[in-house]
Design a protein with these regions (language model features):
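Short beta-strand elements
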Residues: 24-32, 43-47, 154-176, 248-267, ...
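Catalytic core of soluble alpha/beta enzymes
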Residues: 223-442
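Conserved phosphate/anionic-ligand binding catalytic regions in large, soluble enzymes, centered on
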Residues: 15-26, 109-130, 151-167, 211-215, ...
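Mobile "lid/hinge" segments at catalytic clefts and subdomain interfaces of large enzymes
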Residues: 147-210
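Short, Gly/Pro- and small/polar-rich lid/capping loops
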Residues: 1-23
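Metal- or metallocofactor-binding catalytic centers and their adjacent structured scaffolds
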Residues: 46-131, 135, 186, 214
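Glycine/threonine-rich beta-strand-loop-alpha-helix active-site module
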Residues: 135-153
């Protein structure tokens, strides 16, 4: 006889994320039959700053309160319509629950009830089920095959939409590839992070942090950042390449201008002008603006990879530039991870298109891009079955929730992005991975 743990209540509320903006928290209560034992699962929903055009829709109120960012309408959907449909369902039937949520919304982009409504409920159901079974979440999601700790890609220098500086590329990460265990990896990253703070201070640069806990100082370009990171790595006593590698998120869609088909670098342009340099692409006005074509973007990445141990580039080109992505993949596929975030948006249809076109070799997984746990896990399965790496990722607007730490272990992702070893909403994930690593293979 199959176990029956029936949902008795679904309750949503408005809470604050790490940027002080409203987001959704959901509690699902279920009762085990015939014992009558009640269990609660609670989860919250993150929010991104630089979002892909093809992401599922995050609903906001658009009213005066919270500058239009309130989610009271989403909470209302959860507490009325969604609750009415889910009460009585078996909380163990995750696929059926998620199908019901998608059916209730009735749109391709979750624009009716909101991806933030669906995701909060979906994740809370999974948490409630694992609690009801007295089973760790990663084990409930991944079964006995969940046994691999993920390598952290730690965002220590922030730019782009995550910081107010001249850095056009969004994230610069250190990756402790030489670590023998997750505790070692986290220690190495934290040590380098603190040495980086000292170096920035000595150089007279700001050590204020951005949304993801990384520092947000002024640099003119990516090469300056990597040179500074190299100094921090060496000062911490580690070897470039064998101990520590680099990764970056270009977030190129944020730089792309659809009118001229070029990538515009306003921060680098300002930095060049401030030191009376003109390193720009020649243009008719000769105004010193830094503009790059897709080919020049790829050449820049090749230069960086020759000079530094760069093992991963995320969103190296625009989310619609499939031809450019094919060229990027042809030239760099054997040298590094080419990660699609805005390109794929955790969407099975777009991932399948990328596979068919031989575009990229890795997929960034953000559960709120698609709206339900089942759809996210389908995306991971499709990627891994076709030889693509899966990188589990946070968002820039996070909460103290650590669901993605368990998810990364559950699917043996091998890689996780959850910011710098700083700020409570980031360290919550790292600390959960420390706990999980005690029962995992090294």
């Amino acid at each position: 006889m199959s176990l029956s743990i029936r949902i008795t209540d679904v309750h949503g509320r408005e809470i604050l994320d790490s940027r002080g903006n409203p987001t959704v928290e959901v509690e699902v209560t279920a009762q085990t039959e015939p014992t009558g034992r009640k269990t609660v699962g609670r989860e919250s929903v993150p929010s991104g700053a630089s979002t892909g055009r093809f992401e599922a829709i995050e609903l906001r109120d658009g009213e005066e309160r919270f500058f239009g960012l309130g989610v009271s309408r989403v909470v209302d959907h959860i507490n009325k319509r969604i609750r009415q449909e889910l009460v009585g369902m078996n909380v163990l039937d995750q696929v059926k629950i998620d199908r019901k949520l998608v059916e209730l919304d009735g749109t391709d982009n979750k624009g009716n009830l909101g991806a933030n409504a669906l995701l909060g409920v979906s994740l809370a159901c999974a948490r409630c089920a694992s609690n009801a079974l007295d089973m760790p979440l990663y084990r409930y999601l991944g079964g006995m095959n969940a046994k691999k700790w993920p390598m952290p890609m730690m965002n220590v220098i922030n730019g782009g939409a995550h910081a107010k500086n001249n850095l056009d590329f969004q994230e610069f990460m250190i990756v402790p590839v030489g670590a023998a265990s997750f505790p070692d990896a986290l220690r190495m990253g934290a040590e380098i992070y603190h040495y980086l703070r000292l170096i920035l201070h000595e150089e007279g640069r700001l050590t204020a942090v951005g949304d993801e806990g990384g520092f947000a100082p002024e640099f003119s370009n990516a090469k300056e950042v990597f040179a500074c990171l190299q100094r921090a790595v060496e000062k911490a006593g580690y070897q470039m390449g064998s101990d520590i590698a680099f990764a970056m998120d270009a977030a190129a869609s944020e730089l792309y201008n659809s009118e001229d088909g070029m990538y515009h670098f306003p921060g680098e342009s300002r930095a060049n002008q401030s030191v009376e340099q003109n390193l720009a692409r020649p243009d008719t006005e000769g105004n010193g603006e830094v503009i790059r074509s897709a080919q020049e973007m790829i050449s820049l990445y090749e230069e960086l990879a020759l000079e530094y141990p760069l093992i991963s580039i995320e969103d190296g080109l625009d989310e619609d530039d499939w031809d450019g992505w094919q060229e990027l993949t042809n030239r760099l596929n054997e040298k590094m991870m080419l990660v699609g975030d805005d390109l794929f948006v955790t969407n099975v249809k777009r991932i399948r298109c990328g596979i068919d076109l031989h575009v990229a070799n890795s997929v960034l997984i953000k559960v709120n891009q698609i709206g339900t746990l089942t759809e996210a896990m389908d995306a991971i399965e499709l990627a891994q079955k076709n030889g693509y790496k899966a990188v589990i990722s946070h968002r820039s607007g996070e909460t103290e929730d650590a669901f993605i730490a368990d998810l990364a272990v559950a699917v043996n992702a091998g890689w996780i992005k959850t910011g710098a070893p700083c700020r409570g909403e980031r360290t919550a994930k790292y600390n959960q991975l420390l706990r999980l690593s005690e029962g995992l293979d090294a």
